[in-house]
Amino acid sequence: MAGNDCGALLDEELSSFFLNYLADTQGGGSGEEQLYADFPELDLSQLDASDFDSATCFGELQWCPENSETEPNQYSPDDSELFQIDSENEALLAELTKTLDDIPEDDVGLAAFPALDGGDALSCTSASPAPSSAPPSPAPEKPSAPAPEVDELSLLQKLLLATSYPTSSSDTQKEGTAWRQAGLRSKSQRPCVKADSTQDKKAPMMQSQSRSCTELHKHLTSAQCCLQDRGLQPPCLQSPRLPAKEDKEPGEDCPSPQPAPASPRDSLALGRADPGAPVSQEDMQAMVQLIRYMHTYCLPQRKLPPQTPEPLPKACSNPSQQVRSRPWSRHHSKASWAEFSILRELLAQDVLCDVSKPYRLATPVYASLTPRSRPRPPKDSQASPGRPSSVEEVRIAASPKSTGPRPSLRPLRLEVKREVRRPARLQQQEEEDEEEEEEEEEEEKEEEEEWGRKRPGRGLPWTKLGRKLESSVCPVRRSRRLNPELGPWLTFADEPLVPSEPQGALPSLCLAPKAYDVERELGSPTDEDSGQDQQLLRGPQIPALESPCESGCGDMDEDPSCPQLPPRDSPRCLMLALSQSDPTFGKKSFEQTLTVELCGTAGLTPPTTPPYKPTEEDPFKPDIKHSLGKEIALSLPSPEGLSLKATPGAAHKLPKKHPERSELLSHLRHATAQPASQAGQKRPFSCSFGDHDYCQVLRPEGVLQRKVLRSWEPSGVHLEDWPQQGAPWAEAQAPGREEDRSCDAGAPPKDSTLLRDHEIRASLTKHFGLLETALEEEDLASCKSPEYDTVFEDSSSSSGESSFLPEEEEEEGEEEEEDDEEEDSGVSPTCSDHCPYQSPPSKANRQLCSRSRSSSGSSPCHSWSPATRRNFRCESRGPCSDRTPSIRHARKRREKAIGEGRVVYIQNLSSDMSSRELKRRFEVFGEIEECEVLTRNRRGEKYGFITYRCSEHAALSLTKGAALRKRNEPSFQLSYGGLRHFCWPRYTDYDSNSEEALPASGKSKYEAMDFDSLLKEAQQSLH
């Protein structure tokens, strides 16, 4: 039977318990005797106390069934309660939380536990004065009832037993079962068992035979209780971090410690436990955190309204000053947290943001909800008007104290926590706030100028957390859930604000921001004179400092919180108004430091990250609703100057252009506006095509133009494009260009054009080497097709062989001659002047051709450049040209490209294939210098040539280019191009057949060709 009892525990758990147990009892008497008394089921006669240092010793234990005869039915496998353990445990935990929340702080007797006023009333009543905190057997069946007076159950034990089962002698078996589970659950606290075990063992061992629960279970249960009592109380006094966390959640989550301070018995136990068996802060913290975690995530019941919130204030006056901060936090917590629900808060608030994405919010909604607990007390106080007023008075009185030295954040939290129950708490808060405000103001002055014009719409609440603004440590996601380590600060920040934000104080707050703002503007680091108002503003602002949005966003009920935080205007107070009621503050104080970071973290392309807009724009709309005075007060301190009404005081800080809330946004707007204003100027389409506008602006014009030309349709813009690429010639020929400008209304000034040309040439030279040749090749790259030739004749965009016009080859020859003559003769201005195509606006492309020709014709550096001649030849339809040099250069260039294997010959093109489309498809393999589509007049078939800049790209296109065709198109036949296809009608290349035959016959392209394509290829080779 006893085996069943201990069978619930793992061997290692049992062994560790015994080791701890022995360690605790070494000073109290024979370990063997006590063990035997506590665990009658074990026959320890075989073992020495020295044997217990080994974890394996328990394997030798013999279980004595005769010792457990008294409780045969306790462990009966038929006990139906065994199957209810899981559900009971859950109910037990929930009931524990609920009951403890309802316990008055002055009365910790059984009267507080309705379930215990029955059979255990006597033992519990005697529990308070009992000198020993060691809980005895939970429910004695035998007449050993008086024994509980000395060997009393711990408060938590009784609660555990009472909540799950009504305590009575008939329910002892159930209690035993529950205790077994409690023992199992308490193994996480096992390290601390040692500290309390001595007290537990002080209880008389006479009842061990008759107890319904083994001492092991009792001990484990009591250990948990004691651990909580000590772990929660001392931390309030000693650990700066614990108080914050406990105040915020343990107040409700682990209420057991709360009654403890008020209960003499608990205080005795605490006093005894600390000196006798000190528990490390880490253990207590771990315990508290575990309990709080369990309650926070598992027990929504804890948020039910407390049944006895009134008694809580008693704790504040309770003589046990050791937990001085605790009573206040409890009062706060229970008043607010019992009803607090994140979901309820979110639903209740008019949240303008997407709550599901806390990282998108300037201040996480979760963090901002905590302040709800702050407002709650004000609400309670509002119910009793005396309280809010007192709070305000305290704040006002505290304002002079703001000069006090500013303690470190954590100690600061502690101090405030302790005094939170008293108005002094507000004073300390305000002191801290003002001290931080002074530091913040200095930082703000600098930061505001730096960040004042970054995205005002987005602020980060936590930038101020550890004075780490400068290091940009402000995390965007500051919710207790995501950042539990910050929980204490968050909660604390929320709570202090409550008194400072009574709605009654709202008018004063509104006025206060003005005075405060004025001082802010002056930059006085110590705003103590405006202090009282500022105190009201700043007192909450330390908390706001931590979760600035909390007061503004979470406290939807209280507009004052909004104005309060904005006046402080600290860059860390990044308040986003999540509700229409809080817009004033929300808009005004935004952290500019993180605006760019926020924008960038979501995505560096604002067009693709609309989520920043709601937080950025919505907060501004509500501002209009607020009174002008408030807006002015808030706007003055706000570095962003987000307020629509810029007051003269803050004018120097406020950017006048409200719509442009960030540098990036303004930059983009300027970039987009520029093309509109430039309509008819150089590159109006630069912002409409290619990469993002803000990326394009920074790129060299040559690169941009190449990209744009692919998608740009002829609309007369080409007239404006030519000056860019013609820079070299334009430099030499200012007059010619001026004439051209007369034709091109709105052409950019000469200086700007030259500057762009220099940039283009520099980038091209750096990448390709020889300036003019590279420039021409770059410029002509996109002019290979007839469409390109007609539309972008002037652009000369990176196509070294634009001479191959898809138009009539004879016409090309004539154009070549004309262009060559013109260029060689160097009659640029005359040509452009008398060129018949220059005047008609309808033929803008031809005008450009002539102008380009004229401007470049006289340029000595271009007289020898074949690319230039070809380009102009293609573009020009004018009368003057000399073709011999261009033919010569074109032939050399083609021969060079073919010899390097950079020319790809594509046959079997669809009838609707254009050079532009062909180039667009094959650009995936690499940069294309030239692309043209030609038609065989005899058969009407289309074929094309693509000249890549790199031979590797050409080889890649040969192997994979066949896959670029559409389903309704015939298969492409690709091969290395021969000279024959580039020859003018009067020129014959006798080697082209042999050069072309080799690739055509032995290339892998045939592997990708279907039968029809192969047949056509064979037929073509025969002709």
UniProtKB/Swiss-Prot annotation:
Region called Disordered, residue ranges: 122-148, 165-210, 237-278, 302-331, 369-463, 520-567, 601-623, 636-683, 717-758, 779-867
GO molecular function terms attached to this record: AF-2 domain binding; nuclear estrogen receptor binding; RNA binding; transcription coactivator activity
Stretch list, region Abolishes DNA transcriptional activity when missing: 1-91
Summary of the tissues where the protein is detected: Ubiquitous with higher expression in heart, brain and skeletal muscle.
Sites bearing Phosphoserine, chain numbering: 384, 524, 638
Tagged with keyword Nucleus: yes
Biased composition (Acidic residues): 429-450, 806-825
Induction statement: Repressed by saturated fatty acids such as palmitate and stearate in skeletal muscle cells. Induced by insulin and reduced by aging in skeletal muscle biopsies. Down-regulated in type 2 diabetes mellitus subjects as well as in pre-diabetics.
Keyword Phosphoprotein among record annotations: yes
Function according to Swiss-Prot or TrEMBL: Plays a role of stimulator of transcription factors and nuclear receptors activities. Activates transcriptional activity of estrogen receptor alpha, nuclear respiratory factor 1 (NRF1) and glucocorticoid receptor in the presence of glucocorticoids. May play a role in constitutive non-adrenergic-mediated mitochondrial biogenesis as suggested by increased basal oxygen consumption and mitochondrial number when overexpressed. May be involved in fat oxidation and non-oxidative glucose metabolism and in the regulation of energy expenditure.
UniProt comment concerning the protein's domains: Contains 2 Leu-Xaa-Xaa-Leu-Leu (LXXLL) motif, which are usually required for the association with nuclear receptors.
Designated name of the protein: Peroxisome proliferator-activated receptor gamma coactivator 1-beta
Taxonomic source organism: Homo sapiens (Human)
